[in-house]
Each structure stands twice: as structure tokens, then as C-alpha cells.
A protein has these predicted regions:
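Conserved strand-loop elements at the edges of beta-sheets that form or border functional pockets
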Residues: 62, 70, 94, 105, ...
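Conserved beta-propeller blade repeats
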Residues: 114, 256-271, 297-317, 337-356, ...
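Surface-exposed, glycine-biased beta-strand/turn segments
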Residues: 1-88, 120, 129, 168-235
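Blade-level signature of beta-propeller repeat domains, shared across WD40, Kelch, NHL, RCC1
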Residues: 527-560
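Zn2+-dependent peptidoglycan hydrolase active-site motif and core
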Residues: 71-110, 114, 133, 137-143, ...
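Multi-bladed beta-propeller domains
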Residues: 235-258, 287-304, 326-342, 373-390, ...
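A flexible loop/linker signature enriched in serine peptidases of the S9 family
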Residues: 132-135, 256, 275-285, 318-324, ...
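Conserved, short, structured surface segments that act as functional micro-motifs
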Residues: 90-91, 116-194
Length: 560
């Protein structure tokens, strides 16, 4: 684990401001680092326009009033200075290191004065909430800047912590928007750019993935034509960087900085990913045969978009009109559906599309959202629900949908079922705010995690049996990342801030029993919480890390 140990032995002079010390109590340290998560792409000219268009720091979830400590010895430069992050902020200079640290969204103005000396580990402030409610978005926003307070650096490269470990929460990976002209750029927590206050928008990509559904005057194609070339029926890329290697539990199928956000094909024989493997290869979807990875990746298609579950249709935006185009793959016929400049999702049977419309300028904590459903050919558009902070969770059997609604004046949520046939709502129960909800394959079991609750007994990973007459949450014996394997088996990776490798376990929702999947260890670190279970439940694909660098795509065989 030499490479792993270097994660906390390089020149990282800063300690964490509240994690992992606060994490065991609050179970809420999920880092959101720099660059641009896909959901924030549209804010690069507004919220983040003054700082290069990127989220230029790290967000650390914590309940209001959590103590913040100085990340290093320093001198207070300003309290509530012109540095954003309301309602209060604090800037501390570290002249001996050549950096400054900025703490934002504080509960109250710190009781400090400019010029005052602070010591590393000394309590200097309390966490607050951007919405100033303490139930909206309580977190600390931390930036590392230069001493001129202009250049902003990636905190992961300067804070003495293992961010791959801290990212292991919930059911989804930490992904980033992609520049389609350089699809491997800025795709890990450690590989993030610097930004400058007042500097250019560095993520104003000409071609971005996921596609931007908003209307634009620019009518260029969605993908760079010069990088697409699918004339040949089969294109084989050059072999991946260096020879493929093995670990105690699995094998590498692609090397180098390849293959973030991978997914499986339906028959579990191939892992696919968006890539341009080398300068002589086209941009598009590639796949590697997990049984014969030495043959290299095979080009699948240059067509990017949202595919229906049965692969009969593909959806993509017409940005000149702000509408969605649906294309039937069999004959290329297309038609337009007005999804109000929002990306749609296909229904599980591929016969309809669903989208949520809302005002971008409205505060996200209380904005009105409308849920729409239309037949896949665009006919019969109908409003399913008009509400505030009601989010679709998953499709259920019998033409029903599971949703979660924020309780006004609280972080609690009400879980309810919406009938798509008559609009009837059936409330199940009210719960503390649920995060990263995931449904088992048969839609019976719901797993989620809770954090940031004052009563620490409410924090943790929870299981809900939706087929029970009166569903009651059951606390699970772990906290970390999780994915469903099948109808009743949940695979999880415990979140340990000090782990030197990542271990997989399986929890059986029916029996309540857990087992280690790889008792001899994996010898691997998962990057970005980026891993997927094959549809047949026999394999795990993951993006690995070696120190601060990505280490390719790996496959682990699950033995029963």
C-alpha cells in the first residue's frame, strides 16, 4: 500500500477543518470538490461566474453549530470580508506556507479580529447554512487560496486526508461534467483545476457531457464532428497504458486514467464507458470484454444521448429550440417534445418520458417543481404533480411512482406513492432527510442514509420494506457506499477515513446476515466511489486509484 500511504504523506500542510473528527458522530462528511458536477453546469456563468465557472472549494456537510478548527497556524485577515459564502465568512492567512484558508457559510461572525494569531486545531468558527435555516443545506465551504486571495487551489491536494475514503457514501459516484474534446480531463477528486477570481470561465466547454438541455443561440452540433469516425464496423483502440495487472481479488481490464462512470452491458460480458482512448481513436462509447481484456477496448457507437431501457430510442436536445428530440433507432425517425429545457428520463417500459420543470432562479430550498409525463411519441403530455421540493425516487410496479417531499420548515421528508393513472397520493411515513435512496431490483426494499441529525441515533444507513403493511425503518450495521446486487442482497463498502484498501461486504435484507465478499482483501482503492455491479450479480466493476492518480478499470468476480 505504498502508493496509498503517499496520500497523506505528500506536501499537504493542512489538517481537515472538521472531518473526520466530526464524521463518526454526524455521518455527514461527503466532500463536494472543485470543478463542475453535472447538476451545476448551468451555474458556471451565474453562481460561480466570478471564479472561473467552477465550484472552487470543498463542501463538508455538518449540522449547524459544529466546531470548525484552523487548518494550520495563521493570522486572521478578515471576518465577513468580500469573499462570498454568506451569511458569514472568515479568511485566515498562512504566510509561512504561502496560502490562505477561507471558511464560508458560517453560523455567525467569528469572534476574531484581523491580525489575531490562531493555531492549527484551534476552534475558530461554527458551521452554518446557506439558506440560514439550519435545515436547508448546512455545511462548511472551505477554500484554499494564495496570499493575494485571488487564486483558488484544489483542497484535496493540500489537506491531509484521503478523499477517496471520504467519498464512500451512498449509492452513486462522485462524477463531473466532461469536456468532450478531452473526455478524461478533470475526472477525479485529485485532478481538479485552479481558478482565479475574475478569471476566465475555464469550464465553458464547446462540447459538454451530459448535454445541456437549455436553449442556446449557438447551433453547433452536440459533439465535435472532427473526433467522430465510425466508418468501420469495428474499431479497436491501441492497448491501454502498460500491461494489465491483477490484485488479490480481481483483474485490471483497462489501465491509466481511463473509464470513469462505467456501466455494464445487459448480458454482463462487457463494461462500457465514454472515452477517446488515444489520438487516433474516435470519441464515443467504448466497451471492454471482461473475459478477454487483453484484446483492448472495442468501439461501440458515436451516438451520445439518453437511451431508453430497451435501446429502441435515444433522446438528445435541440439546443436551438430548447426541446428534446426522440429518435427511433430502428429507422432514424425523429420527433420533438417540449420538455421545458429539461433532460427527460424514459419510463421503465420505454413507452413514456418523464421530466421535472422548475425556475432556475428560484431558491432551491423552496422552489415550485412540476412533474410531467408524456407518451414516448410526444402525445398525451400531462402534469402529474405540482409541488415544492418533491423529488422522484423510483418507479414502482402497477403504474406508480415513489417520491419524497420535504416537510415545510424542516429537513424531514414524507415518503409517498403517486398513482400515474389517477394522481392519487398515498403517504407512507415521515422520516429524517433521506439521502442517496436506492431500491432493490424487485422494488421491495429501499435503502438510504441519514446524516446531520442532532440525535445521533437517527444517523446511519437504513432499510425500509415497502411491502410491509406499516413500513418501519430498520437500521443497518454499516455506514458507507452501497449498491443492490439483486432483490435482497446489498453490497456495501464501509466508509473508513483511515482505510488503506477498500473492502466489499454483502448484506442480506431478508436474513439480516452480512458476509465479506473478499476475505483475503482486495488490494484496491475505489476512486470517486465509482463502482457498478453487473446485471447478473456476479461481478463488480470499479475505477481504481493509486495514490492521487487513477489506476484504470478493474473487475472483481463475486463468489457465492
Amino acid at each position: 500500500s505504498t502508493a496509498q500511504n503517499t496520500l497523506v504523506s505528500l506536501e499537504r500542510p493542512f489538517q481537515t477543518p472538521l472531518c473526520p473528527a466530526a464524521q463518526p458522530r454526524h455521518l455527514g462528511c461527503r466532500p463536494s470538490l472543485t470543478a463542475t458536477p453535472p447538476e451545476l453546469t448551468g451555474q458556471r456563468f451565474t453562481t460561480y461566474g466570478a471564479s472561473g465557472g467552477i465550484h472552487f472549494g470543498v463542501d463538508l456537510s455538518a449540522p449547524c453549530g459544529t466546531e470548525i478548527v484552523a487548518v494550520a497556524d495563521g493570522i486572521v485577515f478578515a471576518v465577513d470580508g468580500p469573499f462570498g459564502s454568506p451569511p458569514h465568512n472568515l479568511m485566515v492567512d498562512h504566510p509561512q506556507l504561502g496560502y490562505a484558508s477561507m471558511y464560508g457559510h458560517l453560523l455567525q461572525a467569528p469572534n476574531l479580529l484581523p491580525g489575531q494569531v490562531v493555531k492549527q486545531g484551534e476552534v475558530i468558527a461554527l458551521t452554518g447554512d446557506t439558506a440560514e435555516t439550519c435545515y436547508g443545506r448546512p455545511h462548511l465551504h472551505l477554500e484554499i487560496r494564495d496570499l493575494n486571495h485571488v487564486t483558488k487551489y484544489n483542497p484535496a491536494m493540500l489537506i491531509n486526508a484521503n478523499w477517496h475514503n471520504l467519498a464512500l457514501t451512498g449509492s452513486t459516484a462522485r462524477d463531473f461534467a466532461r469536456n468532450l474534446e478531452a473526455p478524461r480531463q478533470w475526472q477525479s477528486l485529485y485532478d481538479q483545476p485552479e481558478a482565479r477570481t475574475g478569471g476566465p470561465i475555464i469550464n465553458d466547454f464547446a462540447y459538454v457531457w451530459p448535454f445541456d438541455w437549455r436553449k442556446k443561440e449557438d447551433t453547433r452540433p452536440l459533439t465535435p464532428v472532427s473526433l467522430i469516425g465510425s466508418d468501420l464496423p469495428e474499431i479497436q483502440a491501441a492497448s491501454s497504458t502498460g500491461p494489465l495487472v491483477a490484485s488479490p481479488a480481481g483483474r485490471q481490464v483497462m489501465g491509466g486514467d481511463c473509464c470513469t462512470q462505467p456501466y455494464w452491458n445487459k448480458d454482463s460480458t462487457q463494461v462500457r464507458f465514454l472515452d477517446r482512448p488515444d489520438a487516433g481513436s474516435p470519441l464515443g462509447i467504448w466497451g471492454v470484454d471482461v473475459g478477454q481484456p487483453e484484446t483492448g477496448p472495442q468501439f461501440i457507437t458515436e451516438r451520445l444521448g439518453i437511451y431508453s431501457p430497451d435501446n429502441a430510442y435515444i433522446a438528445y436536445p435541440d439546443q436551438s429550440k430548447g426541446v428534446t428530440v426522440i429518435e427511433r433507432m430502428a429507422d432514424g425517425q425523429t420527433w420533438e417534445i417540449d420538455t421545458q429545457e429539461r433532460s427527460p428520463n424514459f419510463t421503465p417500459d420505454s413507452k413514456g418520458i418523464l421530466w421535472t420543470a422548475y425556475d432556475d432562479d428560484a431558491p432551491s430550498d423552496n422552489r415550485e417543481e412540476t412533474l410531467w409525463l408524456a407518451d414516448v411519441d410526444g402525445s398525451n403530455p400531462r402534469l402529474l404533480l405540482k409541488d415544492r421540493r418533491s423529488d422522484p425516487v423510483a418507479w414502482l410496479a402497477g403504474n406508480k411512482m415513489l417520491l419524497a417531499r420535504r416537510v415545510p420548515g424542516s429537513s424531514d421528508q414524507t415518503l409517498f406513492i403517486l398513482s400515474l393513472s389517477d394522481g392519487r397520493q398515498t403517504e407512507l411515513l415521515q422520516l429524517p432527510q433521506m439521502r442517496s435512496l436506492a431500491l432493490s431490483d424487485d422494488r421491495r426494499y429501499l435503502v438510504y442514509y441519514v446524516s446531520l441529525q442532532p440525535d445521533s441515533s437517527e444517523n446511519g444507513t437504513w432499510l425500509l420494506d415497502l411491502q410491509s403493511a406499516k413500513p418501519q425503518p430498520q437500521k443497518l450495521p454499516f455506514f458507507g457506499a452501497y449498491r443492490w446486487r439483486d432483490n435482497e442482497r446489498l453490497i456495501y463498502v464501509p466508509m473508513d477515513p483511515n482505510a488503506t484498501e477498500h473492502s466489499f461486504f454483502e448484506y442480506n435484507a431478508r436474513t439480516g446476515q452480512s458476509r465479506s465478499l473478499f476475505p483475503g482483501g482486495t488490494g484496491l482503492t475505489i476512486a470517486n466511489n465509482d463502482w457498478r455491479i453487473s446485471p447478473d450479480g456476479t461481478k463488480i466493476a470499479l475505477v481504481a486509484a493509486s495514490g492521487i492518480k487513477l489506476d484504470g478499470l478493474w473487475v472483481l468476480d463475486i463468489k457465492d
